[in-house]
Amino acid sequence: MRDLVLVVDFGGQYNQLIARRVRECGVYCEIIPYTYSIEKIKEKNPKGIIFTGGPNSVYGENTPTLDKEIFNLNVPVLGICYGDQLMAHLLGGKVDTAPVREYGKTNVTLDNSSKLFAGIEADETCWMSHTDYIAEAPEGFKIIAHTDVCPVAAMENEERRLYGVQFHPEVEHTPFGQNMMRNFLYNICGLENSWSMASFAEEKIAEIKKIVGDKKLICALSGGVDSSVAAVMVHKAVGKQLTCIFVDHGLLRKDEGDQVEKIFKEGFDMNLIRVNAQDRFLGKLKGVSDPETKRKIIGEEFIRVFEEEAGKLGDIKFLVQGTIYPDVVESGTDTSAVIKSHHNVGGLPEDMEFSLIEPLRELFKDEVRAVGEELGIPHHLVWRQPFPGPGLAIRVLGEVTEDKLEVVREADAIFREEIALAGLESEIWQYFAVLPNIQSVGVMGDERTYCHTVGLRAVTSSDGMTSNWAHIPYEVIDKVSRRIVNEVKGVNRIVYDVTSKPPATIEWE
């Protein structure tokens, strides 16, 4: 059984980032709600516990708290921000409203004789975000960091292995944060760098073999990262017992359907059924302009097509799904099981009698990509950009027609090709063309034109939650613009979206 660190969620915005930082140290961790009972925590047998930040005050009404017994488990605890204040409050320290609030980059003085700050400079920069502060540390605790306005920026009870920091070590703005995290995990908890994607894949493949036996499985394959990695992992475990159903709704990017079929059918020798359903989907979308209605129609039609194809395959016992850890955390479900009864996951019908195989439900997105590379999936597929489930239907504003799809598909292909030629693929989080349902007057040759406008969208981001518009060199934008106007029939104007998120979303619909 692998060693485990528990991250107790108190509602902070960086909670998943804390878990990712722990995993980056080669240590497995899980996020649990603060309502988890002491009995459940004992059953998990953690080697370390981390309290996250949160938006509350320890003195507020109905504020998140937990049983003080957690400090008597002889397990090292690290409290971060609110978690630090809660530790102080529960153990008899004094928490109060800070006379001066601290937000953003802050100079901090560290006592690097502490195990927590071993090997770190005494004068550092950290990221603060708090309105309350610890005015007095609990009895038995030593102050090991301070700022000009925060007398207890970090504290420790070395004997009980209890540590608290007011700042956020998990964010990039705290440069020493990951070194501090390693000190806590390795030197204080006694853990080792043993959690790797190679070992995870090996364990999971063996587990799937044991669960499935000689039964048959199906997988709804979209060509996206999550479903692709899940399908390949299960295929490596059970081979031809798995059949993948690829519903080609005609809303994919240029040549994408053919690429998916080639990679998985030929490259991995999978049983793959490709359902060419473009006419069926476009028929359902005829006359529909509202984006939410488009999404709903596409989702419902996908279910129907998938159900019809699954029904032709006979006795199927398992459904493979590419659920990943953020989905699990956000739904508040337990993370321990690789298999559970199917219950309308992903909108699939209630009466589909499958058990669910979710081989990636313990992994974050970056870990899924790493596993994909371990499994031999082509780099360009593992690192493909996010692509919405409804596909190009939400990049064609207004009614979706075959002609409009062809325009946005060709424009998008040119944009992606030129970004690749400019060597900018790894610098831009997402980039695509959109057809905003605008026509404008132009002149081509000596004739007046009245044609489509194509919008180009490119953003930089680390997680997609917020983003900035990408400052692509003018010469690249110029070349893209000229190529689209000259090579894509029915386009006479190109615009570039220079809006960040927020206020805009990345997609236009």
From Swiss-Prot:
Gene Ontology, cellular component aspect: cytosol
Domain Glutamine amidotransferase type-1, residue spans: 4-194
Recorded catalytic activity of this chain's protein: XMP + L-glutamine + ATP + H2O = GMP + L-glutamate + AMP + diphosphate + 2 H(+)
Pathways involved: Purine metabolism; GMP biosynthesis; GMP from XMP (L-Gln route): step 1/1
Domain GMPS ATP-PPase: residue ranges: 195-384
Residues engaged in binding ATP: S222, G223, G224, V225, D226, S227, S228
Protein name: GMP synthase [glutamine-hydrolyzing]
Native organism: Clostridium perfringens (strain 13 / Type A)
